[in-house]
Amino acid sequence: MQRSNHTVTEFILLGFTTDPGMQLGLFVVFLGVYSLTVVGNSTLIVLICNDSCLHTPMYFFTGNLSFLDLWYSSVYTPKILVTCISEDKSISFAGCLCQFFFSAGLAYSECYLLAAVAYDRYVAISKPLLYAQAMSIKLCALLVAVSYCGGFINSSIITKKTFSFNFCRENIIDDFFCDLLPLVELACGEKGGYKIMMYFLLASNVICPAVLILASYLFIITSVLRISSSKGYLKAFSTCSSHLTSVTLYYGSILYIYALPRSSYSFDMDKIVSTFYTVVFPMLNLMIYSLRNKDVKEALKKLLP
């Protein structure tokens, strides 16, 4: 008998394993990662706000990325921690919808924001004399606002379409959060139009920003090759290396999950990759942007007694 989506009051999240010992081990690992993410990103945001030396476009974007990663991780990890140690693996229909909406909105926003950072790096390296004028605080704020608006507008579209399906099968989600592909597996009805829309949103929100990032780095490489001194060359490379590492890890994870042909898709492998970009990546992003950064280290020394 079919059940329409309004009769589904909750979903069951299978998570990673049913073994109690392994669940406890995962709880400890995820708690440690989440604690580092919260403390580290919060500290970085405070440093950027308090230290005038960090009041530059580059650190403005870094601070916003830290805020986004902090928010992004908080959408998933608290529920994952509860699921690991609780007998109750359920999530309400409204809770699943909210988790889906915010996760999609923040994921899309990060794609746009990473593209904005790439543009900032391009201007800093290719047009250093015009950098302060070109990357004004108004433009930086506008780029961040557009990133969030674009992300959440598109998230509203895909959330509405996804949760308008009739969930006529079991309400068991083979994942640790309310992700797109496991939810679509539970839905019944014609999905052809939905899949077209899904891949259109993937192209417009993920592929297009990736193309902009690639174009920015092609221009950056062209500019770097014109630098005669090895010191200037290394400085330009170090300016971009952290961002390029972050982009590669983030886009690689997303494209692996959502862009692979359906026949090669594995829910078990998806769980591992999803864990990386939802839980681990926000912590890695913090390390990538701050641990090797001399300005951040100096600001931290000033803050600590």
Swiss-Prot record:
It is a multi-pass membrane protein. GO terms for molecular function: G protein-coupled receptor activity; olfactory receptor activity. It is found in: Cell membrane. The gene is OR9G1. Keywords: Cell membrane, Disulfide bond, G-protein coupled receptor, Glycoprotein, Membrane, Olfaction, Receptor, Sensory transduction, Transducer, Transmembrane, Transmembrane helix. Belongs to the G-protein coupled receptor 1 family. Residues 46-53, 120-138, 217-236, 292-305 are cytoplasmic. One of its GO terms (cellular component) is plasma membrane. This is Olfactory receptor 9G1. Residues 1-24, 75-98, 160-196, 258-270 are extracellular. Pfam families: 7tm_4. Odorant receptor. Disulfide bonds join 96-188. It comes from Homo sapiens.
